[in-house]
């Protein structure tokens, strides 16, 4: 069982390094497109760090999330992902594969694959989603306004 766990960690590390290299090798993203992508990454970093203030800073005040067939606002997300998440050993590592990113003045939309390795209560799972986010530019900063998430795999 420990060998299997170690093997899973090694495979996950290889995938993470490969995707990081792939994302760094991606050519052709404009500065604006990269800023949109980084806004999404920072939002998920705040979520991973269980930092509700930073999470709110990366979202519009009227953010809506479409998760598991439900419509959530920012308070629902904070409650489910931060407030109720009391595991002392919680760790979440996110890996993104950006598929498309479009910008038009103060609005942008981005589609990506998200893979999250999550440790909670000494158990590690990996969840993969396909997501599309709509962002608005507020005071020269991109913020997530809508996020639609489709669960692809959980193991």
Could you say what each language-model-derived stretch is?
Residues 23-57:
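Short, low-complexity N-terminal intrinsically disordered segments enriched in polar/charged residues
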Residues 128-155:
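Short beta-strand edge/turn micro-motifs at domain boundaries
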Residues 81, 96-101, 114-116, 130-136:
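Hydrophobic/aromatic beta-strand elements that line small-molecule binding cavities or substrate pockets
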Residues 59, 69-70, 113-116, 148:
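A mature extracytoplasmic/lumenal domain signature
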Residues 52-103:
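A solvent-exposed, acidic/Ser-Thr-rich amphipathic alpha-helical stretch
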Residues 89, 116-126:
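Short, cysteine-centered beta-strand-loop-beta hairpins and adjacent loop/turn segments enriched
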Residues 101-108, 123, 135-141:
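A short, structured loop/turn motif at beta-sheet edges
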Residues 1-30:
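Bacterial Sec-dependent N-terminal signal peptides
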């Amino acid at each position: 069982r420990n060998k299997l766990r170690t093997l899973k960690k090694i495979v996950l590390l290889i995938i993470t390094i490969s995707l990081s290299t792939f994302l760094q090798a991606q050519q052709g993203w404009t500065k604006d497109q990269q800023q949109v992508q980084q806004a999404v990454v920072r939002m998920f970093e705040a979520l991973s760090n269980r930092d509700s203030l930073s999470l709110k800073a990366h979202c519009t005040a009227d953010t809506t999330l479409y998760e598991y067939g439900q419509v959530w606002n920012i308070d629902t997300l904070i409650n489910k992902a931060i407030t109720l998440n009391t595991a002392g050993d919680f760790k979440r590592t996110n890996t993104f594969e950006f598929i498309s990113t479009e910008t038009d003045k103060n609005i942008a939309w981005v589609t990506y694959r998200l893979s999250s390795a999550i440790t909670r209560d000494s158990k590690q799972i990996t969840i993969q989603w396909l997501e599309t986010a709509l962002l608005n530019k507020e005071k020269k900063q991109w913020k997530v306004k809508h996020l639609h998430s489709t669960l692809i795999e959980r193991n």
